[in-house]
């Protein structure tokens, strides 16, 4: 990117309008680097609820008419993006578009955006408007107090496209303890030494992760990107990670450096990787040190500066 962030946050960004809901990065002080932000109100269920999206669209339309921005930056406003892409294709919307989430559209529509921010390099292949940025990891990592347990344990967390069946099978017979935290605990099979917890407050989730000897992110084989947030959180906590090869997280975990990679669905592979990291203190410490060195890549500050540089480039 030819643009570069300035020392003074927000300088040069008067022609950028952010449209988002107040969540994750967009609820942080780092997001205040962008001086003009339109936040949607969450009045019904999840932020992606249609009513919430309609209300944000109304507020966004008013702000666009008033400010006439040259760049529209879509944050956590996933369902609003397809409408913007249609308006851009019809040449009704003239502002340049930066999108940070592609849940509700694919590459066919993505080409109508000036930049689509994605969280793995694999997603940029053959897509000139797609740009890889490391995902910003959610959590106050400095304030995390690691969970204290009677014996070492492996931790796995998350919900989307998780392969907990393979993980639980891998732990069987090892005598190792495993703690799983997921929004859908009923989907996790019962297993020896396995403790399952439901949805947790973020800092409690991170405390369990921080207290683990090893973090495991078992992912299903899928073209859809997934698992980045949990992996980035583990790296920010300086944890050695076992995760799935080819599941779009290889930009985060390099085999033998930040952790170990296993083929999708490979029970024996997961068992060997987990047992190896738990038993080999030297390897585990080396992976933890590498993780800590990578942590700044996933900070809110780094993400904010990268988005700023991107917007400044489009404003040139």
Please provide the spans of the model-predicted regions.
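Donor nucleotide-sugar binding/catalytic pocket of nucleotide-sugar-dependent glycosyltransferases
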Residues: 104-106, 112-143
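Conserved catalytic-core segment of nucleotide-activated headgroup transferases in glycan assembly
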Residues: 139, 148-205
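Short acidic/histidine- and often glycine-rich active-site loop of Leloir-type glycosyltransferases
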Residues: 188-190, 246-256, 260-261
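Nucleotide-sugar-dependent
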Residues: 203, 217-233, 246, 250-251
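Acidic donor-binding loop of glycosyltransferase active sites
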Residues: 209-224, 239
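Conserved acidic donor-binding segment of nucleotide-sugar-dependent glycosyltransferases
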Residues: 253-256, 260-267, 275-282, 296
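A short, well-ordered alpha-helix in the C-terminal region of glycosyltransferases
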Residues: 269, 276, 283-297, 306-309
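C-terminal alpha-helical cap of glycosyltransferases
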Residues: 300-316
């Amino acid at each position: 990117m030819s643009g570069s962030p300035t020392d003074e946050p927000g300088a040069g960004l008067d022609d950028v309008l952010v449209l988002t809901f107040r969540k994750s990065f967009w609820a942080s002080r780092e997001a205040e680097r962008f001086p003009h932000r339109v936040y949607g109100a969450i009045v019904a269920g999840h932020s992606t609820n249609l009513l919430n999206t309609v209300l944000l669209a109304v507020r966004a339309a008013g702000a666009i008419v008033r400010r006439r921005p040259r760049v529209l930056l879509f944050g956590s406003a996933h369902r609003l993006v397809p409408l913007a892409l249609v308006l851009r294709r019809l040449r009704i919307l003239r502002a340049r578009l930066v999108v940070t989430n592609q849940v509700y559209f694919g590459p066919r529509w993505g080409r109508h955006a000036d930049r689509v921010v994605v969280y793995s390099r694999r997603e940029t292949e053959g897509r000139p408007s797609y740009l890889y940025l490391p995902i910003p990891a959610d959590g106050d990592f400095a304030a995390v107090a690691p969970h204290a347990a009677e014996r070492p344990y492996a931790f796995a967390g998350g919900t989307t496209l998780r392969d907990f069946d393979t993980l639980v099978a891998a732990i069987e017979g090892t005598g190792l303890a495993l703690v799983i935290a997921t929004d859908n605990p009923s989907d996790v099979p019962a297993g020896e030494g396995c403790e399952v917890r439901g949805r947790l407050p973020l800092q409690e989730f991170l405390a369990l992760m921080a207290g683990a000897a090893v973090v495991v992110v078992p992912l299903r084989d899928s073209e859809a990107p997934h698992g980045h947030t949990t992996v980035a959180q583990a790296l920010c906590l300086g944890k050695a990670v076992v995760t799935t090869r080819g599941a779009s997280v290889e930009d985060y975990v390099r085999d033998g450096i930040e952790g170990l990679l296993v083929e999708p669905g490979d029970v024996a592979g997961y068992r060997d990787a987990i047992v190896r990291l738990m038993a080999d203190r030297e390897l585990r410490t080396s992976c933890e040190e590498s993780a800590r060195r990578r942590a700044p890549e996933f900070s809110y500050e780094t993400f904010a500066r990268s988005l700023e540089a991107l917007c400044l480039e489009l404003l040139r």
